[in-house]
Amino acid sequence: MTITKAKIAAMLSSKLGFSNNLCEEIVHTVFSNILEIAKEQKLTLKNFGSFEVKQKNPRPGINFHTKAPVIIESKKHLRFVPSSKLKALINESTR
């Protein structure tokens, strides 16, 4: 299931009784702050999981079209590790 920030804001608005515009601003601010923190350091959301930016080292690869060896450049990737509580909730709901 894919959910948009607008849908999250609409759900908050209906649940809390705030205006949709205020809820959209809150959701945007929360996600922006999470992204800023996650860019710089490991971010752990209690009972949800951890986000961490990791650096991948350069490595050898092969160009599939020419079969020539190439070096795949280093790059950053985002790693998410779910908390044990989130894992338990997911496994509990599938039983």
From Swiss-Prot:
SUPFAM superfamilies: IHF-like DNA-binding proteins (SSF47729). GO terms for cellular component: cytosol. Gene3D superfamilies: IHF-like DNA-binding proteins. GO terms for molecular function: DNA binding; structural constituent of chromatin. It comes from the Bacteria. Keywords: DNA-binding. Belongs to the bacterial histone-like protein family. This is Histone-like DNA-binding protein.
